[in-house]
Amino acid sequence: MTMLGERLVLRWRVAASFAWSVILMPVCCALFIVLSRIQILHPIQWLTDSISDLTSSYTIFCLLLICAILGLQCTFLMEYYTVVPSIPCSRLALIGNLLLPHRILHSLAHVAMGVLASWCYAVLSKGKYQLLVVSCTLQSEDEADKPSHCLNESHLFQLLCGAFFGYSYSLQYFVHNMNYLSFPSIQQYKYLQFRRFLPLIIKQSVFQSLYFIRSYAILYFCLGNIPRTWIQTALNLHMDRQQPSLDTLRGFLNLSLFYQIWLSGTFLLATWYMVWILFRIYTTEARIFPVQTSFAEEAEKCLPFILNSNTLPLVKYLAMQDLVLLSQYSPSRRQEVFSLSQPGGHPHNWTSISKECLNLMSSLTSRLIAHQEAAANNGRMRVPSSPKQIRKSSSSSGTSLIEDSAEQTQNLSTIPRIGIPSLLKTASLKSSLDIGSPFATPGVKQMSESLDPNTPCHGSVQSPQVTRRGAKLWTSDSDVQKNGSEVSPVMHRPVCNGAKQGILHTWFQHKLVQIKNVLSKRGLIMYLFSKHPEASSQDVFADAQIHIWALEALSHLVAASFSEDRMGVVQTSLSSVLAILLTLQEAVEKHFKLPHASSKPARNPGSLLDSSCKTLRFSLRAALKTAIYRITTTFGEHLHAVPVSSEHKKKLQQFLDFKE
C-alpha cells in the first residue's frame, strides 16, 4: 500500500467521524437553547421562545461556526494521534513534553477555538450576556446623565472562560494521553460503542466543567482586572458603576452568570469529547486486508507485505489486528496463510507473517533484558567503555538475542584491558593530593587514602610496563633521544601540572555533589525531579499492544495448524516459535520481580479517559502465558519431538503439567 493510499484510509475515517459530528450538532444546539432559557414558571412561553429561536439567522450562523470549530478539532486529532503512548518518567519530563513547539501550537489553537465557541454559546443564549459592548448611562456630579458605551464584563468573563477551557482541555489531552488510540478488545458496532460512551461523555463534561469553573473563578478573582483594563482601554469603553465587578465577592454571587458559564462549558466539552470519541471509534475500526492476490500490482495491499513494510503505524496496527481476527475466526483465510506459492511451492505467506511476529517478540525480549541490566547496574560502579562502544550501544535496538549475547561476550572480554594512561592519571592524582590544602575536602582525603602510593612522582611504579612507557608518555622526543630509556627529571613538571588540574576537577565535582545534595532537600526540586515508581516499567511496555496481537495471532495459527496445515509449513518453524515464546516468558517473569513492576494501578471504569496504557504489561503477561498454554494443550505430548534446548524442555513440561 502506497503512502497516498495509507493517508486516504485515515482521511476517509476522519471524514466519517466529522460527518456524524456535524449531524449531531443541531440536536446539541437545540438542547442548549432550551436549557439556557429555562423558565419553570412559564413553560409555554419557554417552549415557544426556544422553538422560534431555532430557525433564526444568528442560530444558523453560530451552528455553522461551531461545525467549523469541530472541523479544526478533527484536523488536530488526525495530526496528533499516536498508537504508542508517551510515558514521562518525572513531572519535569511531563512539563518538558508540554512545552514542545507543536504542543504549544495545539494549546494556542484550542484557546482560540474555546473563545469562538464561548461567543457562539453566548449569542445563542441571548439575554444580557450576548454582547461585549452595551449601552449605559454615566452619572456625573457637574453634568447631567449622558448615554455612553460600557464594557459588558459578564460577556468578557464568558469569553475568557472559553479560553481557559480550551487551554485546560489541551493540557489534559497530552497529560492523560488522549491522543493515544486504544483498540477495543471486543469488536462491536459503531452505534453500540457510541451509545456506551454517551453517558460517560455527559458525566465527564458536567463534572469537569464545574472543576474548570472553580479554577477559573479563582484565577479571575486574582488577575481579572488585567484583561478587563486592557480591553477597556483598547476599545475606549467605560465601566457600568451600577453593576458590581466580577473580581469582588459581591460580583461572585451572580448565580445566573455562573449557570450560564457552566452550561456553556458543559456543551463545549461535550461536543469536543463527542468528536474525540467518534474519531477513536472510526480510526480503530477493524479493516480486512487480503492475504494474497493474483495480480502483482495489488501485492502492496496484501497483509504479509504491510506487516513487513515501513508503513504508517496506524495501518500496521490495523493489519496486525486483522491478523488476530483472521487467526481466530476465519478458517478460509487461514488456509491462505498455510498455502504454498505456485509455481515453486514456497510458504511465502506464513514465512512473512511469522517472521514479523517473531521479530516483534525478539525486540521486546531484547528491550526487557536491557532494562533488567540497567536496573541491576543502577548505583554500581561501571567500567568505562570506549566512545565507539558507547555509540554502538546507544544506536543498537531491536536486534536478535543471539547477536546481543555475542556482543555482551565481547564487551566482557575487553573489561580487564584497562588502558595505561588511566592508571597513570589516577596515580599522579594520588601523589599530588595535599591533605592540608584548602581543596582537601573530606571526599578528597578519602580518595587520597584509598590510592596506591607507588606512583611516578614517588619515584617507583608497580608495573615494569609502566616504567617502559614512562619516557614515551611523560617526556618529549628530544629527551628520549638524549637519555635513551631513562626517565628525564623534566618529567616531574607535567605531572604536577596535571595533578593541579586533577585537584581542581575533583574539587569541582565535589562541589557539584554538595549542590545536588542541598537541592535534593528542597520540596519543589524533589517534586519536579522525583521519578514515578512505575514509569520506567510502563515505558518499556508502551507499545505492547502490537506484541499482544502478535502473540495471539501466532499462537492461534500454530494451534490451528495442528488440524488445518496439510503441507506442514508451520511445523518447520515450530521450534523457533517455542524458543522465542519461552525466552520472552522468562524475561517477562524476571521483569515482574523488579520493584514496582508488579504494582497494578487502580482503574476507574466509570471514567471517559482511557488508562489502559498503564496496564499493558499485565495484559501482555496474561496473553503470553495463554499463548503458550494454547500451543501446549493443542499439541500435547507431540512437543517432545520438537528440537528445543534442555531448559526450554523443562519449561514446556511445566506447561504440559499445568504447573506454570
UniProtKB/Swiss-Prot annotation:
Disulfide-bond pairs as recorded: none
InterPro entries assigned to the protein according to its UniProt record, in alphabetical order: Nucleoporin_prot_Ndc1/Nup
GO molecular function, one term: protein-macromolecule adaptor activity
Region feature (Disordered): 375-408, 448-471
Biological process according to GO: mRNA transport; nuclear pore organization; protein transport
Ranges facing Perinuclear space side: 35-57, 125-154, 227-256
Compartments where found: Nucleus, Nuclear pore complex; Nucleus membrane
Membrane topology, Cytoplasmic segments: 1-13, 79-103, 176-205, 278-660
Transmembrane segments: 14-34, 58-78, 104-124, 155-175, 206-226, 257-277
Entry superkingdom: Eukaryota
Biased composition (Low complexity): 385-403
Classification via Pfam families: Ndc1_Nup
Chief subcellular location: nucleus
A GO cellular component entry from the record: nuclear membrane
Its membrane topology: Multi-pass membrane protein
Keyword vocabulary terms for this entry: Membrane, mRNA transport, Nuclear pore complex, Nucleus, Protein transport, Translocation, Transmembrane, Transmembrane helix, Transport
The family this protein is said to belong to: Belongs to the NDC1 family.
Function statement: Component of the nuclear pore complex (NPC), which plays a key role in de novo assembly and insertion of NPC in the nuclear envelope. Required for NPC and nuclear envelope assembly, possibly by forming a link between the nuclear envelope membrane and soluble nucleoporins, thereby anchoring the NPC in the membrane.
Protein name: Nucleoporin NDC1
Gene: ndc1
